[in-house]
From Swiss-Prot:
Coiled coil: none annotated. It catalyses: L-glutamyl-tRNA(Gln) + L-glutamine + ATP + H2O = L-glutaminyl-tRNA(Gln) + L-glutamate + ADP + phosphate + H(+). This is Glutamyl-tRNA(Gln) amidotransferase subunit A. It comes from Rhizobium johnstonii (strain DSM 114642 / LMG 32736 / 3841) (Rhizobium leguminosarum bv. viciae). One of its GO terms (biological process) is translation. HAMAP family: GatA. Heterotrimer of A, B and C subunits. Allows the formation of correctly charged Gln-tRNA(Gln) through the transamidation of misacylated Glu-tRNA(Gln) in organisms which lack glutaminyl-tRNA synthetase. The reaction takes place in the presence of glutamine and ATP through an activated gamma-phospho-Glu-tRNA(Gln).
Amino acid sequence: MSELTSLTIAEARQKLRAKEITAIELTEAYISAIDAANGRLNAYIKVTPDLARVMAKNSDERIAAGKAGELEGIPLGIKDLFATVGVHTQACSHILDGFEPRYESTVTQNLWDDGAVMLGKLNMDEFAMGSSNETSYYGPVINPWRAAGSNQQLVPGGSSGGSAAAVAAHLCAGATATDTGGSIRQPAAFTGTVGIKPTYGRCSRWGTVAFASSLDQAGPIARDVRDAAILLKSMASVDAKDTTSVDLPVPDYEAALGQSLKGMKIGIPNEYRVDGMPDEIETLWRQGIAWLKEAGAEIVDISLPHTKYALPAYYIVAPAEASSNLARYDGVRYGLRVDGKDIVDMYEKTRAAGFGKEVKRRIMIGTYVLSAGYYDAYYIRAQKVRTLIKRDFELAFDAGVDAILTPATPSSAFGVADENLAADPVKMYLNDIFTVTVNMAGLPGIAVPAGLDHKGLPLGLQLIGKPFDEETLFKTAHVIEQAAGRFTPAKWW
């Protein structure tokens, strides 16, 4: 890793403004790093070096003129779920072959308006459906981390695996990601990076390929808490084009870092102690509690009694919304088209060829739970459970809790093509056990690296906050980060 690519966003920002480095130099360093590493990691599916150089040149001109934006000259990777004008946007699916949008997503436009530079589009699970980044049409992403003494390839988590791997391997300064049931926080935990899923409505969904519209939310993956705070400030905005966007001012999240935790109450939910959870995860959780206690926070036990129903309810609601959202991909207007003897045959052949196995599975689950005779038994009941989950959190926060601390994942990163997980999709779905409640309740959640397991792989802790109180999450996560230190993989790629 070069000296330039090892800079955090905050460090690079300072050097760019002081004119110690140029945006062109920084961008070229990342382009070289991607060229050298992407063949092994498969984090990027489309690199845009020419566009990056033009954007970097423009940044240098604005810096020279004293008109630097908040992210001026900072090279970023963009998850392939965000529409980027004239640049490949496929949600890593065969069915969107060759699709290049004529418009820009609100989130990416916000970043460009603040001066960021686009390095390319990042790999992900197809249509964001997966927990390992193995469902991508472009093949799996490889985690930059390896277990001590092992050459086994590990997954980076999903669906934002490309984002997490690129950030961990220093192939971008930071990355955009999305989270429907844990797709920012789980990959962050698996790669020793920081990922925040903001409150539902904090970042616009306009121009972001939809998976489950009532659950999807964009957020950043970054190397540390400060960088995540810087990125979220630029990504977040109110947007008239997204009816779920909330009209609240975007705070200066970075200003929250370093604030005292004295007087804060941190809730510890007993329901997150699940059967089969490794002792290492429990030990890490206790360590996190101790760090926050030392920082002046009061630790209180809380109950979130409907947590056990969250995963089954999520895997009804999310596929139901996905089956509706993905009905639009039919080969008529854009993307893949497989010719048939008539229009119905063309639809069927296009969808059969265009969607991957996991996407088909979830479409079928969703169509089933929305069908006559099952709608009330499954979908309506799942929505009622969702209301109860949200109510559990409301009661905890009403009782004076400021944030909730839990593990981020039930394990560290597992192997690529794990036979046990491939044979039983439910085991793969259990990766989301600690994260789905946050999406079901529309709350903010952040994953922060907190230690290494016995194999030397990163483990993360999760903080859950009140609606639109990301500032509390950032300041609390910063305390954990300061106590735990930062974690970087040994370079093998």
